[in-house]
């Protein structure tokens, strides 16, 4: 049986400040200003000791994003910057000063400018998106049929059904 691909929204730094890093290095990465080593060295999320919500974000990033899953890079709650597919599962890049927690990504669309409305009041670092209408929207971006005025309505609909992790 073929494994279902998932769609993960990952903020490219507040306001997209590390989007250029994502594109240049073909990665998506997260950083919580902590001294955590590789997440794979920990037995459970509680051992991370970064706070309950952060523990879940970091743990899911390292353990649940799988090869071929779709990665939607965003600015936070307003714009999709790019869409790609995971080509390398979680790894820890000790050579970086920040944003050491990484996954390899083949960026398929990097034009940006696709509007959406994220879930207000919730940290948007990582979300597993299960909304079929938004997934259809991501697919329209990938296949070149995205239409801003029509698709914007879809992105604003049912914004509360992200799976917050």
Predicted regions span which residues?
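Compositionally biased, charged N-terminal/linker segments
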Residues: 1-60, 161-164
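ATP-dependent helicase/translocase motor core
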Residues: 3-6, 112, 116-165
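Compositionally biased, intrinsically disordered low-complexity regions
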Residues: 15, 86, 106, 115, ...
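Short conserved micro-motifs at the rims of enzyme active sites and ligand-binding pockets
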Residues: 19-23, 95-96, 114-120
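Charged/polar, solvent-exposed surface patches and flexible loops
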Residues: 20, 60-63, 88, 148, ...
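Short, low-complexity, polar/charged sequence segments that are solvent-exposed and flexible
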Residues: 27-32, 90-94, 103-104, 122-129
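Structured alpha/beta reader/binder surfaces that contact nucleic acids or chromatin modification marks
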Residues: 36-113
């Amino acid at each position: 049986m073929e494994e279902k691909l998932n769609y993960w929204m990952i903020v490219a730094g507040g306001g997209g400040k590390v989007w250029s890093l994502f594109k240049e290095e073909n990665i998506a990465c997260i950083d919580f200003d902590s001294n955590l080593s590789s997440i794979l060295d920990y037995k459970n999320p509680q051992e991370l000791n970064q706070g309950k919500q952060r523990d879940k974000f970091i743990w899911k990033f390292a353990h649940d994003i799988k090869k071929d899953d779709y990665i939607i890079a965003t600015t936070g709650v307003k714009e999709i910057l790019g869409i790609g597919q995971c080509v390398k599962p979680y790894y820890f890049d000790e050579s970086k000063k920040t944003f050491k927690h990484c996954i390899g990504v083949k960026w398929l669309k990097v034009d940006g400018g696709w509007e959406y409305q994220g879930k207000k009041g919730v940290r948007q670092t990582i979300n597993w998106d299960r909304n079929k209408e938004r997934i259809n929207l991501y697919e329209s971006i990938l296949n070149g049929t995205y239409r801003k005025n029509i698709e914007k309505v879809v992105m604003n609909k049912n914004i509360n059904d992200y799976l917050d992790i």
